[in-house]
UniProtKB/Swiss-Prot annotation:
It catalyses: N-succinyl-L-glutamate 5-semialdehyde + NAD(+) + H2O = N-succinyl-L-glutamate + NADH + 2 H(+). The lineage of its organism: Bacteria, Pseudomonadati, Pseudomonadota, Betaproteobacteria, Burkholderiales. The gene is astD. The active site is at E244, C278. This is N-succinylglutamate 5-semialdehyde dehydrogenase. Pathway: Amino-acid degradation; L-arginine degradation via AST pathway; L-glutamate and succinate from L-arginine: step 4/5. It holds the Pfam family Aldedh. Catalyzes the NAD-dependent reduction of succinylglutamate semialdehyde into succinylglutamate. Gene3D superfamilies: Aldehyde Dehydrogenase, Chain A, domain 1, Aldehyde Dehydrogenase, Chain A, domain 2. One of its GO terms (molecular function) is succinylglutamate-semialdehyde dehydrogenase activity.
């Protein structure tokens, strides 16, 4: 087997064996050995050796490589979509959009580098002020499973454009997609050692995060893991740590004339990607009146008809399996805890086969649950909270340590003005799903949702550091010298 990619060559891992499985069938998709601590060390040292030449190359040369990568991603879009669907359970219609996003990210990242970093000059009385940006060196990229191609790409592309060398540790649940992506980078002509792949589970990640020769760590994943990394690097200011994590995201339903439009956007917010987007709505605030009752009745009715099926089924389902049998079981267990604490099931989640990752979407009214836990249930589990006044809804919506996304569905523009002024989140949408985001805008949020804005336009900010210079081509004595100096 050749599980790892180090120094421009595929190599066998020397750590424990592991495998990924199609969550919709249970069949093995990828099998191999993880990277041991020694393998990780070789990968980091390979990146360090490659860094000097890569960072010394021109921005145009680096951009030419990433543009070739984008072109190859477009050519191989169907193969990528198939790999994403097979390994994650994501329906092909959605996997194709992920592959397209991988290619689209390149031009946005190039634009971001030029506009937010790059080089700028301004004249001074006695010279020229120059602002340049320099790469950090060797950066580790940790990728998630829900978008195993697109989200790591949101770190890797801007890091490479800035001149960094990368060691990529993908999710152990999607190693096959990572291997295919790295092969495309190789075919695009990326020099040996500039991008290295270390496959593996927890121990591989620990070895990479603990390596003393990395200059930065860029992470997209769970808040729990990101918080551990934040604690780990708390005493190491020399490490650039960029975190994009999850959210307990609120969606507030206000007065609307088009109930079906509100229901559609709520379903998209809560259940797209089987609820496995960090921006999915987890808490849905519904007015405690007749209009709220009508909304809930229609929301429950339409949700009950959502199709769930295999990634390559024809016709395509709206939802595929969640990432694993374990994830499915945890979601069902979370539902049972909420029901035991007083929640009312408007639509109960079912895992029809305990050996597979398929679950049906759930709608639970948790209004009467005391001390509701502030946690992200990463799947199709929507919690309904009835409210009396709009200010009450806002107060409860902000009652979270997270701050990734939030949304308001309402016809009244005055409510929107109040909402966007009051809500605490990094992505705040009006009459659009909570998981709708522009690649040309910051992606992320405050609190336990992260500290930087990975995966989009602002990623350039943490991939390079500013270097300020005052320059003069000719060495000259000043017209006057400071008091106390004699020449």
């Amino acid at each position: 087997m050749s599980e790892l990619f180090i120094g421009g060559e595929w190599a066998a891992g020397t750590g424990p064996a592991f495998a990924s499985r199609n969550p919709g069938t249970g069949a093995a998709v990828w099998e191999g050995n993880s990277a041991s601590a020694d393998d990780v060390d070789r990968a980091v040292r390979s990146a360090r050796r490659a860094f000097a030449a890569w960072s010394a190359s021109s921005v145009d040369e680096r951009c030419a490589v990433v543009r070739r990568f984008a072109a190859l991603v477009t050519e191989r879009k169907e193969a990528l979509a198939e790999a994403i669907g097979r390994e994650t359970g994501k329906p092909l219609w959605e996997a194709r959009t992920e592959a397209a996003s991988m290619a689209a990210k390149v031009e946005i990242s190039i634009q971001a580098y030029n506009e937010r970093t790059g080089e700028k000059r301004s004249a001074m009385a006695d010279g020229t002020a120059v602002l340049r940006h320099r790469p950090h060196g060797v950066v580790a990229v940790f990728g998630p499973y829900n978008f195993p191609g697109h989200l790591p790409n949101g770190h890797i592309v801007p890091a490479l454009i800035a001149g960094n060398a990368v060691v990529f540790k993908p999710s152990e649940l999607a190693p096959g997609v990572a291997a295919l992506t790295v092969q495309i980078w190789r075919d695009a002509g990326l020099p040996a050692g500039v991008l290295n792949l270390v496959q593996g589970e927890k121990d591989t990640g620990i070895a990479l995060a603990n390596h003393r020769q990395i200059d930065g760590l860029f992470f997209t994943g769970s808040s729990d893991t990101g918080t551990l990394l934040h604690k780990q690097f708390g005493g190491r200011p020399e490490i650039v740590l960029a975190l994009e994590m999850g959210g307990n995201n609120p969606l507030v339903i206000g007065p609307v004339a088009d109930v079906d439009a509100a229901v559609h956007h709520t379903i998209q917010s809560a259940f797209l990607s089987a609820g496995q987007r960090c921006t999915c709505a987890r808490r849905i605030f519904v007015p405690n009146d007749a209009a709220g009752d009508r909304f809930l009745e229609r929301f429950t009715e339409v949700t009950s008809r959502i199709t769930v099926g295999e990634y390559n089924a024809d016709p395509q389902p709206f939802m595929g399996a969640v990432i694993s049998v374990r994830a499915a079981s945890r979601l069902v267990a979370a539902q049972e805890r909420l029901l035991a604490d007083g929640a009312k099931a408007l639509l109960k989640m079912e895992q029809r086969d305990p050996k597979l990752g398929f679950v049906t979407p759930a709608i639970l009214d948790v209004t009467n649950v005391a001390n509701r836990p502030d946690e992200e249930h990463f799947g199709p589990l929507a919690q309904i909270i009835r409210y009396g006044s709009f200010n009450e809804a806002l107060e409860q919506a902000n009652d979270t340590e997270f701050g990734l996304s939030a949304g308001l569905l309402a016809d009244d523009e005055a409510l929107w003005a109040h909402f966007q002024r009051t809500i605490r989140a990094g992505i705040v949408n009006w009459n659009r799903p909570t998981n709708g985001a522009s690649s040309g805008a910051p992606f992320g949020g405050p609190g336990r949702s992260g500290n930087h804005r990975p995966s989009a336009y602002y990623a350039a900010d943490y991939c390079a550091f500013p270097m300020a210079s005052v320059e003069s081509a000719q060495l000259q004595m000043p017209a006057s010298v400071s008091p106390g100096l004699q020449f």
